[in-house]
């Protein structure tokens, strides 16, 4: 019996990726459009530094929600977003009201990131790629709007609301789908009680199963952080591109969608390509144009995230019957993203 692919579920998981990215997009809009320097005002500091800090805080937060009532959260998010953009456009207390609305909405939008991971990552692995692809598509769309200065027009925030709406429709389809229900059943032990309906590994059990991958992820992070510090200090590749560099800091959420073949060998291949791009930037600053150096920087980041994606895939395979695997993967992604973001931001300020 051959496996069939549900194309409606593919579209739904792709849309769910749009919804999951809403918190990152929200932070991106304020950090790039409403902020010109991370140390200019306290509002700018808030917009730029909120993403790594909130990601670190979210690791320690437990979220339990009734999926059928999340429509109220959607209305709240859209209402706050609309009020924020209107306040900014009409210059209504933008120094106090807008930052306050930003924080409230950012924290509540993080709930979508958590619940979307929890639902989609219990479905078969093929749907993970479309979820991550939707996440990446949302970030790319907003990046293009910024690149072509469409944010200066009257429709500058339309994509945010569109992604939220279609994302919620897709999310509602996914959590009601049989694939999600079967995914939860896969995590049930043969014998279970009321208190232990699902297999839930402890932190020590996870460390025992996925220790090698976690060590590799840590060493890749250290290498990438050291590389970014070196490039900030000894090259000008990051000069003037902080607006667009922001998106490279959250690649652990979505770059796995572009990987065709994932293995330890491919982890090594991606790492070598990333290292090569780093040395080309560092040593060939006078041989390449500004655009070419920016392209090499993009290659360096994407290959790094692809190497991480291969390792995260191996962790998911090893822990496929663990009910908390989706949240564990999300926590690892948030930790890696936040530490890299903090490293780059501090390096830019200290040079």
From Swiss-Prot:
* Subcellular localization, as worded in the UniProt entry: Host membrane
**Keyword match Transmembrane:** yes
Q: Which gene encodes it?
A: 58
Q: Which UniProt keywords apply?
A: Host membrane, Membrane, Transmembrane, Transmembrane helix
Q: What is any one of the record's Gene Ontology cellular component terms?
A: membrane
Write down what this protein is called. Answer: Gene 58 protein
Q: Which family does it belong to?
A: Belongs to the herpesviridae BMRF2 family.
Residue ranges annotated as transmembrane are 14-34, 43-63, 70-90, 97-117, 133-153, 155-175, 214-234, 240-260, 268-288, 293-313, 328-348
Q: One Pfam family, short name please?
A: Herpes_BMRF2
As for membrane topology, the entry says: Multi-pass membrane protein
Signal as UniProt keyword: no
Q: Which domain of life is it from?
A: Viruses
* Gene source species: Alcelaphine herpesvirus 1 (strain C500)
